[in-house]
Amino acid sequence: MYNRVYKERQEIRTIQGLEASGQFQTASNITDIQIYSINVTPTMSKGGETGETQLRRLMYLSASTEPEKCNAEYLADMAHVATLRNKAIGVIRFLLYSSPFFFQVIEGTDEDLDFLFAKISADPRHERCIVLANGPCTGRMYGEWHMKDSHIDNITNNPAIKTILFQIARSFTSMWSYLPKNAANMLLLGKNPNKQGPEPRSVVLTFIYLVEFSSILAHPGLTEQCADILAAFVEASVRNCEGTWGLVAKFITGTCVAYWPINRAEDALVGLQQLSEDLAVLRSYQPPGSALSRIYSRRGVHYGRALLCNAGFRKADFTLLGDCINTASRITSLSVKLKVPLLLSFEVRCLLGDEMREELERSALHKVKGRDKPVQVYQFNAPELDSALVRAKIEQFNPGRYRALCPVKPYESLHPAQRPPIFDDTPRENQPKLSQVQRRDSLVDRLSLIAKLAFPSSMMAGGEGQLITLTYISQAAHPMSRFDLASIQRIAFARNESSNITGSLLYVSGLFVQTLDDPKGAVESLYLKIRQDKRHKDVVAVFMAPIDERVYGTPLDMTSATEEMLATFPPLQDVLSQLAKSFISLETYVPSTVVRYLTAGNNPRNLQPVSVEVVMLATDICSFTPLSEKCSLTEVWTICNTFIDACTSAICNEGGEVIKLIGDCVTAYFAPTGADNAVHACQEIVSFSAQLRDAFHDVLDCRSVVACGVGLDFGQVIMAQCGSLRLTEFVVAGEVSARVMAVEALTREAGRAIVITEPVSDRLSAKLRDTGIVPCQEGLHAVLLWYPGPRMGIGCANHQEDHLRVPRRPGPGRHEEGGRRHQRPGPGRPRRGHPFLPQGSTTRPHQFSVQLHPLPKLGTGSSDGGIGVSLHVYSAGRYRQQLHRRQIAAGGQRRSVGPGQDVARATRAHACDAGHQAPDQPANAQYERQFRGGQQRWRTCGIVHSNAFVTGVGLVQQPWLDEGHRPEAPHQSLHPGPGDPSEQHPHRPNRATEPGLLVARQPAVCLHRPEGFAQICTF
């Protein structure tokens, strides 16, 4: 479609596309203009006065394999040979060389371009040809610009131009290996991945799991070798998947997702079986102590329809979406239960030939999570792969003195200049808050981090007065007329002159390139102000380095960079514009850590594998599996794209780092000090889901049912890059990576939208910890914590309330069986709330647990020294008090208690021996009768209420105590706060006068006998 522009009945221009027409109208400052649209048939591609048809323009970037030879003479010889060939076939080309990169634009017919580019790609003098643009053109833009000596030094001495060409090209080629394979293929075809619409495909999909990789991560002796394991797994997966005509979609923690076309089902199974054999060979050749001898894989294969699409905006992923992805994941999980290394669905079996079908063995119908109908699966005749045996081998594994090839080092042990930029620690408090629309198109500000990483020690020693140069690029928010540019130059010149800042500003086809020279403090301050300017967007700092003297002599040199230089070499503006746009587009697919490391002038291959503690976040859409079954592929894409957009924006706005986009699931991490930011991001995600449902409540739209759960956990992860130049992954892996998914799954069971664990709650600010958290009875085999607090968040369809909930985590001496047993409420107890508080009670309890330890007799090696008592008190979630072993004289009949044996759970205590009658119940105490092994046992719990605190008494029948025995005086409190902990608290009660009931100033542990109470210790 063409648009013909008329003014006063005279045609002044013909423009292709409505958008270009609007830009022309704005830039020309013409108000009385009329635009007419004309639809044109295939002759649209007819170009120029020569009558040529099917003209196309192709722009590519490549890296020289011989940069040391690329001098002026070398380029002149190359240009002479190319010019003769171009004239013979009627192709127009220009070449720009900026060491070590070639930029070339070719104009010609489809047939000529395909022939020429095939020969160019095979030329050994360069490598990694990346297409920046490839599309039809209406005419030859560069006229007779044949292959001239186009060395950058012969075109301009402008340092901004040289910097932008080198830095963007360098970052562009480095990011290539981090791109999803589909996005990289799009670029090779000259297409922008984030501009492509969803494309339905029939695929054979597989999930490849590293067996018991979480056990490897949890093994303290194998932490150093995790990077080696991941590197070997990534390399083997890429080699076998791509070697059988497949593509790797993504890598998750210890998981590879790959797919094949519908006609490559047999090749897919051959590749997966070969992967298992390669890992077996790898295990057999490992020296003693190598963790690679414990690497096994498990695969599940499914066939179905999926949508190849771009999901997300600020951080995006070019991936597959659809119900078949969820089913393939469930089938792989089912293989754990069936103890088989390879499991495939009935749909995959139908795609196989007769010969391979005969080798299959049916494994009957099985129910998988999230699906109403059972799934019929098949397997090959292969040895069993038992996860329990692999786990046992890993737990018993001793690495000895083996040293990893890529050792993982603690993050804190590295010098600040050597630490990878894994956290976005840009200070935001002093910067004006931006609206969501303003922040949407802006990339994460990396200025202060670049200053820490890229500057040498000599520059850091110079402080704020060190002279530096900063170059950034940005895109104009709207077309700039000559009056707009004149206004920018006038204001910037006056501002820079007053601040004694020099620099240059280049404007090319909607792209700004600016270089600033000044002391470090002044440049940083000005750059932060420039970022807030609404006249441009996508602000990216591409270069920052110390200099000895100023490059520019004026406050703002603008005209020489736009007119004189571009008049000398017109094609340069297209190179700059297309390269910058492609760089900004690709940055959304590459991890932020890699991008920050690149823009600081570093080689990402030198990123050091580190172990660091982080706050991990995981969120996904509730009931997504049945939702994907009932919705069309386009509706699934709409739901995921909308949800991922909101999640990535909320996470990045709070300083978090997005790790992976896994279908409807988003994982991210925050710094150890960013627990509050993580909670705020959770609240924003939940609020968005609720607002989205409200917005589409009365409209028949699939987004009206979007509800989500969010989980937070804290733990150590390994951050390392794995793979090769073909495909590189920046991996964030750790035991917490799997655990946070289980925490997020608790949102369905608990009926809450946000669930956090105890370590996260310990790192929250006092305001959030004391007023924003409520207890969670469901948990992960751990001690319950109870926090009062108001409701937080917005209600959603699958959740009764949206609270921050704290699940249980493993404590010393606790067992999974016991933890699961006590998760269920007993008869007559409420499902939620404190199991021993009266209904409606608002009293804040102390949560405590009691443990008994056998102690040796003083001065001897005998174990008849008595019982040690440990009381763990969690006071309102703010601190933890712990009293370790307390010596008690032994006497009478002693019960056998193993080391660390848990004899009390939360606020309950076990009875020791059978045959004793339950004592009279003290006030507010509840008794529970249990039958174990045919014997009656009583367990007693007492909770005494006060205004704001609760004094807990753990009661245990102990017949072995001597009659009339009284223990020593109480220990002093371990209260971490200032002042004497034994002082009377205004809200704590005095000792009670009721007979048989101890009410202490501090929480106390008591042992109960039928004759009365004996205090052991208080604190």
Swiss-Prot record:
Q: Name one GO cellular component term.
A: motile cilium
The record's keywords, sorted A to Z, are: Cell projection, Cilium, Flagellum, Repeat
> Which GO terms of type biological process are on file?
cyclic nucleotide biosynthetic process
Key word Cell inner membrane present: no
Q: Where in the cell is it found?
A: Cell projection, Cilium, Flagellum
Residue intervals passing through the bilayer:
none
Gene3D superfamilies for this protein = 3.30.70.100, Nucleotide cyclase
* BLUF domain ranges (all copies): 55-148, 467-559
Q: Which Pfam families match?
A: BLUF, Guanylate_cyc
Which CDD domains does the protein's record reference? Answer: CHD (cd07302)
What ranges does the record give for the region Disordered, renumbered to this chain? 801-846, 887-923, 963-993
* Residue span, Guanylate cyclase domain: 204-332, 615-744
On the tree of life, the source organism's domain of life is Eukaryota
Q: Which GO terms describe its molecular function?
A: blue light photoreceptor activity; FAD binding
Q: Where is the composition biased (Basic residues)?
A: 821-834
Q: Anything else the record notes?
A: The ST- strain is deficient in phototaxis. It is not known if this is due to defective adenylate cyclase activity or defective BLUF domains in this protein. In wild-type E.gracilis, photoactivated adenylate cyclase is found in the paraxonemal bodies (PABs). PABs are absent from this strain.
Q: Which family does it belong to?
A: Belongs to the adenylyl cyclase class-4/guanylyl cyclase family.
Describe its partners and assembly state.
Heterotetramer of two alpha and two beta subunits.
Q: Which PANTHER family does the entry link to?
A: ADENYLATE CYCLASE, TERMINAL-DIFFERENTIATION SPECIFIC, ADENYLATE CYCLASE, TERMINAL-DIFFERENTIATION SPECIFIC-RELATED
Return the protein name.
Answer: Photoactivated adenylate cyclase subunit alpha-like protein ST-
Give the encoding gene's name: pacA
